[in-house]
Amino acid sequence: MQTRGIRNNNPLNIRYSKDRWKGARTEQTDPAFVQFETMAYGYRAAWKTLESYWKHFHRHRQPFNATTIISRWAPPTENDTQAYIRTVLRLSGLGGRENLPQPSRGVDIAKLERLITAMTTVECGIPYKDVDTQAIRDGYDLAFPGKRSLARTQPPAELLDPETMEELLMWDEYRD
C-alpha cells in the first residue's frame, strides 16, 4: 500500500493553506493534505515552500539550515522534531547548522536536493536511494524556470546499507 504522500503526489505532506498551488488536482479528496497532479508538482510546492522559509528566515536574521527548516516544517506540537532532524542529517550528510543556499538562486542546489530527498524518506518511508530525484529536479525546474538543473547526488555509501536503512525507516508515526 502506498503512503499518503505518494498517493497524493505530495511527498513532503504539505497541508492545505491559503495557497492555491499550481498543479493541484481539481478534485481534492484528502481532508488535510494537498493532492497534486504529478510528483513534480508536489516537489515544486516543496521548493516554493523552502523559498518562502528562506525569505522568512532572512527577513528575521535567522539561519537557513536543516535544523531551522525542519523545526518549522515539522513542529514539536505535531512531530518528534529532534528525531526528524537527526534522521534527515544522517541521511543527507548535511550538518544541522550548515548554511544552505537560497533555493531560487540555483547555486549549490545539490545540498537542498539531499535535504528534500531525506525529508521524503522521513515523510513517506521510502529508502533514501529509492526517492525519485528526477521528480525533485523537475519540481525545481517548475518552481524556478531557467535556473541551473540539479546535479545528481548519491548518498554516502554507508547509508545504502540495508541494516542502516531499516533502522532509519522505523518511522511508524510518519507512515500511513
Model-assigned labels for residue ranges:
Residues 1-176:
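Cell-wall polysaccharide-cleaving catalytic domain and substrate-binding groove, primarily
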